[in-house]
Amino acid sequence: KSNGHLISEYKGWNSLLVTKFDIKKGKILDSNYISSHYPELNNKQKIFVITKGVFQMKHEASESLLGEYDAVDFVNGSQTYEMKPLEDSIIFMISAINLTSQSGKSTFFNFKKDIKSKDLWGGQCISRPYEGQGLTLVLFDLKPGFKFEDKGHENEQITWLIFGKMDFYANGEHKTLNSDNGVDIGPNHIHGGVSGGAMGFDAFFPKRQEIKYKK
């Protein structure tokens, strides 16, 4: 715990970092906290995505309410922001230590409302890929019984579930994924699995360059 937040984080082999903040109503997560606790991410792209609850967001001179599957992409570290949950809430931060410093405006979006669904895996999987300057983040929804296999790629990939389960394998190792665990896939490792019905995220660094992952 830190500052009233229950924090879980994982740093991958190519510096990809996924952090889960489980925040109680009334507590605050802001840019000062992130800068002081994650100095290695200063001036680096950070994508925040809400998977539970509602946040009151203050950003620069504006204020808004953010709910489930709302996300904000802070391209660099110059923005100031404050996120206050109006109920017990969960928000993820995705970044990478080895990202180059970037510039640009922040992007607010909702994965389900604003990101077009794509058929990346043949009909049984709804994928919504967001292409950032340095990261790719994909929300996926897998139907029960869906089987898939990827022959591998150079990009680091961290996969985790919001709900459901999936029997997963990577580089010959097998594991059942649920909302409490995930997998970090190594370079060019063959990976795949069978869905028991699941929704979750794939984060990639560097970002995917294939057309199907583009905006």
Positions of the model-derived regions?
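A short, N-terminal "cap"/entry segment at the start of jelly-roll beta-barrel domains
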Residues: 1-31, 36-38, 67-68, 72, ...
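Histidine-centered active-site/metal-ligand motif
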Residues: 32-35, 39-41, 81, 151-153, ...
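Short acidic-glycine-tyrosine-enriched beta hairpin
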Residues: 60-77, 171-188
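Short, conserved beta-strand element in jelly-roll/cupin
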Residues: 40-56, 141, 152-167
